[in-house]
């Protein structure tokens, strides 16, 4: 499936037309996750569909969802912009970014500099880079180019082999451990526990995918995760607020003394 997605992405890049620059205030994803509103940082995802689950939320209003996430204490928002496989759109990200004050990450299969330029123009604060999609040397180039253009990066790994390959090239500021195998699309939260053993102590990392319950969050917290990226369980909830409350076991948002 991943190979098919990447081939589609390469074809899209060939005909990519860059939009006009959107003027928005940049907000740091790194800073938001370093000082989360709850015991774990929450990167809440705006996600209509996926290849593995099909349509996740038919009643889909990205701006309303994004504003609800912010009101419920999410630290940042991830917006799917892939159209073909996730029914996302880059305009969703722009509209969400214009409506909230917390960081917004572009979640897509970013493999080319043109997509980084596009991400800047649509107003993203950060982008996702996936180790399994491109050679590590190229990923490092994209990482550096993104930072030069004012974008932060969440660098995603799944296996011990990928993380060894990544760290042999460079150490990102923020890592995402995907509990989903992108080749089989199967998920296992134990992947975060396993990967935590090989991530250097003190490195910020998120657990991604397959997180549905308070117990799931406690597992990855014990493993050392800085935060979580959650989409499906929040999108399937009766409301984003209810979904976040359920996920965090009713834990309130921290208030400054």
Swiss-Prot record:
It comes from the Bacteria. Keywords: Amino-acid biosynthesis, Aromatic amino acid biosynthesis, Decarboxylase, Lyase, Tryptophan biosynthesis. Pathway: Amino-acid biosynthesis; L-tryptophan biosynthesis; L-tryptophan from chorismate: step 4/5. It holds the Pfam family IGPS. One of its GO terms (molecular function) is indole-3-glycerol-phosphate synthase activity. Its EC number is 4.1.1.48. GO terms for biological process: L-tryptophan biosynthetic process. InterPro entries: Aldolase_TIM, Indole-3-glycerol_P_synth, Indole-3-glycerol_P_synth_dom, Indole-3-GlycerolPSynthase_CS, RibuloseP-bd_barrel. Belongs to the TrpC family. PANTHER family: INDOLE-3-GLYCEROL-PHOSPHATE SYNTHASE, TRYPTOPHAN BIOSYNTHESIS PROTEIN. This is Indole-3-glycerol phosphate synthase. It comes from Halalkalibacterium halodurans (strain ATCC BAA-125 / DSM 18197 / FERM 7344 / JCM 9153 / C-125). The lineage of its organism: Bacteria, Bacillati, Bacillota, Bacilli, Bacillales.
């Amino acid at each position: 499936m991943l190979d098919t997605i990447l081939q589609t992405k390469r074809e899209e890049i060939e005909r990519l037309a860059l939009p006009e620059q959107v003027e928005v205030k940049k907000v740091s994803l790194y800073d938001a996750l370093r000082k989360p509103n709850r015991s774990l940082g929450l990167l809440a995802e705006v996600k209509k569909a996926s290849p593995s689950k099909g349509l996740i939320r038919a009643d889909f209003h990205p701006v309303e969802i994004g504003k609800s996430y912010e009101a419920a204490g999410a630290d940042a928002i991830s917006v799917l912009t892939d159209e073909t496989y996730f029914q996302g759109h880059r305009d969703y990200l722009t509209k969400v970014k214009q409506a909230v004050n917390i960081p917004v990450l572009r979640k897509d299969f970013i493999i080319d500099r043109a997509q980084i330029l596009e991400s800047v123009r649509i107003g993203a604060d950060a982008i996702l880079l996936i180790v399994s999609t491109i050679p590590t040397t190229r990923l490092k180039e994209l990482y550096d180019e993104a930072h030069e253009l004012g974008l932060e990066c969440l660098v995603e790994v799944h296996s011990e082999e990928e993380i060894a390959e990544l760290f042999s090239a460079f150490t990102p500021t923020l890592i995402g451990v995907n509990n989903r195998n992108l080749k089989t699309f199967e998920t296992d939260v134990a992947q975060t526990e396993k990967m935590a053993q090989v991530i250097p102590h003190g490195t910020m990392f998120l657990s991604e995918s397959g997180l549905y319950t308070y117990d799931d969050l406690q597992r990855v917290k014990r493993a050392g995760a800085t935060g979580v990226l959650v989409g499906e369980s929040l999108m399937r909830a009766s409301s984003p607020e209810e979904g976040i409350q359920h996920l965090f076991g009713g834990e309130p948002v921290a208030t400054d003394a």
